[in-house]
Amino acid sequence: MSIKENSKIEFIDGDEGAKIKQYFHPHNTLNGINYSIAQFSLEIGGKTKLHKIKSSEIYYILEGEGKLKIDDEIFRIKKDDSAYVPPNSKQFIENIGSKYLRFLCIVEPAWKAEDDKILE
């Protein structure tokens, strides 16, 4: 069993432009998981860099609203929405709301720096 207290996890700066709290990842979990889950935060007007990752991702929006670009499609997302991002998709997410955009990102297989490529 592993419990992560949100208040005790420090934000790190992501290469793509977001603040990130890494909750579970194979490197910090003892039970041999193959996925990772992290909370991302974007300030008002913030946008991640265009990037692609070899893994599939699921976003679950905790707060705020945004614009999610996946390849050639653009989607509006808001609190309690979820989105599937296929592997190797060109993507970014932008905060278009009036408060922080916070979302969980589940990556399978787990996120690895060498699998994430910034495109801009």
Which ranges hold each PLM region?
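Short acidic-glycine-tyrosine-enriched beta hairpin
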Residues: 72-87
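A short hydrophobic beta-strand segment most commonly corresponding to one strand
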Residues: 84, 99-114
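Glycine- and acidic-residue-biased ligand/ion/polar-headgroup-sensing regions
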Residues: 56, 60-66
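Conserved hydrophobic/aromatic beta-strand scaffold that supports enzyme active sites
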Residues: 11, 22, 37-41, 58, ...
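Conserved short histidine dyad/triad with adjacent acidic residue
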Residues: 22-25, 38-53
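A short, N-terminal "cap"/entry segment at the start of jelly-roll beta-barrel domains
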Residues: 1-34, 118-120
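Short histidine-centered beta-strand/loop micro-motifs
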Residues: 31-32, 47-53, 94-96, 116
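Short beta-strand His + acidic residue motifs that chelate non-heme Fe in jelly-roll/DSBH
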Residues: 48-50, 68-69, 85, 91-98
